[in-house]
Amino acid sequence: MRAHRIDTFLIRENIKLEIIHESNSYFGGEHISIAFRFKHLGSQHELFNYKEKLLTVDKAVEEKLEQQAKVQDDGEGTMENQTWSLKSLLGAFKRTGEPEESVDVDNMKMLNESKMLREKIQKQMYFHQPVTLISGYVQISGVFQYDSEVISESKFKQDEVKMVGLDIVPGHTTNSVLALEDGEHFKGKRNLTNYLNSDYTNVTNGLLFSESGSRGRTGTYNERTLMISNDTSIKTLPLLLIPQTLLFSEISLEPGEVRTFYFKSTKLPKDICPSYSSSKVASINYTLEVGADVLSDDNIEKFSNRVPITIAPYISSNAEQYTSRLDKPAIILKTGNIKELKPRLFTRKVSTASAVSFGRRKSSIIDIDSPLEDNEFVKRVKKNFIELVESNQNVSRDIDELIDLQMGVQFGKDEDSSDPEPNDSHFSNEMVTSAESSLRSDAVTKRRKSYSVRDNISNLEQKMWNDCSLVKSDENSNLLPQLINLQNAYQINRNNETMAKVSLSAPFYKTTDDINLVIELDPITTPLLKVTSLTVSLESFEIINPKYKTEGKGIGSKPKGNSVYEKHFICFDECKSVSVKLLPPRSPTNQITGQFKTDVFQHKWMIGLKFVIIAKTESITLDQFYEDKKGILFHSKENLEGEEFTCYVPIPILCTSEDFMGW
């Protein structure tokens, strides 16, 4: 398991490109930092061996030709010394006529074999030859796509805009293969595909993809196939553009050589709209494009590919988020900063366990200048330890968190800067190295580096335990609080009768959390009814602003949810409670989006509960098949039909402070 998400592509058969994402997701108000590693897959040793083989073949041919020429010269000299008579002339023809033809055939055969062997060696050596790359670049763009049959195009202040660099729908394409789980391949020119190391992927690009149909699976998210490209109802508005940034003008890769370039953008706007692709109506997609030209036999082969990047919303320390604006001109940032990372000559091997648990800290002994300061320091450390123990008696906290707090007092904060510049080679090299050497077992890992947004999210849970009020900090700001009037218990009524009680494990969740809940059925208040089955689903809803709705398209109607995860239960006999665990997807390129709000629509999460209710009788699941004086024979019912009752429970889900790694 790697510590970072890594996307891998082959520029050509012997050049591999690795895109190492500094974080996944990127937050509003922070930088986008990515390392690009160009690696020659050949070997200097193999190249030397093939050159030696070529020299051996050429030398063998030359020796054979020289030997044959010498034999011919000796034969001609012998004939000149003989007496010119009719008998000797006939003898000469008998001696030299047939052998010369045989020698020519042998020579041609030998030359052809040598030529074929030489071509074979050259083909094998081609893989290990140096390669020249020119004009390497990187570009980041973002678009908002929507279905104009639901969201009115005329309601936007700006019409659909075409911007150079944002040619996602009709423009730049790459050769790719998109495969489904059933093995069907779609080949040809495709937009925004070739996302991963493999052709097999369920990554989407919003409305460029449509649902491939219900497959009866649970836990799937955004499994879609490419739509017909001439769908005129899909409209696109540009949101973000970081123009092409030159990685290098020209580099030459020797066999086995690795060149790494570190890209860092300017800070993203805090009110940037997050990535969103779980809807059939609207999607927000951010993509990273990287390209280069390859010099090959006096020809230039172009390479370019795109990968999705995930952007999460900015969250303040009071769990506030900005209301993002989609109906505005696109944000154009400055080009990013580029620095080539040189490999270290001598590196110290760091224990995996220590690297995972803690960052590097300052020594507490070095900072002590006097015995008095030593005594004060020890008292402060002891006092902090006692306070942590006392605070843990009321509310149980994670042991790792307690250790971090104690070590923060004893050894100081991490030496790493929370906002490294592009010329910070220590951080950049550490990022690239840890991406290769990390052996962590989870698909999600806590970041060692400290960022303000991540700190804000990490501290929210502790604030909730301490009953801190998370109210709006500034009434005049565009920040909206996300955690208000929280509760983790709900009572479900039907016709003024209590059906069930729902208890959630937490008042709010993050996108990496398991959602645990218990549903307690109430047979006392509904003695004549029985719940025979229960379906629990995690669904995303988007509530479209009426101002932007197409006239006559579901104005006033209830929004429909998009199911992300679903569990089905059958309730036998006297079933009083059902325990449910909902598992949202958590892969590096397949993750859910936390709640957010824009000027066009608002995204929320709900837990859907569908009960199947039947009248309670003596034999609910049995039918009388036969009866005589000896008794009655029952058979179980093949079908059990009942009345459906559906309701929804709101659930706050925010983005996580943890990273989605790669493998």
Curated annotation (Swiss-Prot):
Provide the positions where the record notes the PTM Phosphoserine.
Answer: 351, 354, 357, 363-364, 370
Q: Which GO terms describe its cellular component?
A: cytosol; Golgi apparatus; Golgi membrane; guanyl-nucleotide exchange factor complex; Ric1-Rgp1 guanyl-nucleotide exchange factor complex
Biological process according to GO: cell division; retrograde transport, endosome to Golgi
Give the molecular function GO annotations: guanyl-nucleotide exchange factor activity
Chief location bin: Golgi
**Keywords annotated in UniProt:** Cell cycle, Cell division, Golgi apparatus, Guanine-nucleotide releasing factor, Mitosis, Phosphoprotein
Which residues lie in Polar residues bias regions?
426-440
Annotated region (Disordered) at: 412-443
Pfam families listed in its UniProt record = Rgp1
Q: Where found, per UniProt?
A: Golgi apparatus
Function (record text): The RIC1-RGP1 complex acts as a guanine nucleotide exchange factor (GEF), which activates YPT6 by exchanging bound GDP for free GTP. It is thereby required for efficient fusion of endosome-derived vesicles with the Golgi. The RIC1-RGP1 participates in the recycling of SNC1, presumably by mediating fusion of endosomal vesicles with the Golgi compartment. Required for proper mitotic growth.
Misc remark: Present with 589 molecules/cell in log phase SD medium.
Q: Its quaternary structure?
A: Forms a complex with RIC1.
Q: Which family does it belong to?
A: Belongs to the RGP1 family.
User: What name does this protein carry?
Assistant: Guanine nucleotide exchange factor subunit RGP1
- Organism expressing this protein natively: Saccharomyces cerevisiae (strain ATCC 204508 / S288c) (Baker's yeast)
Gene of this entry: RGP1
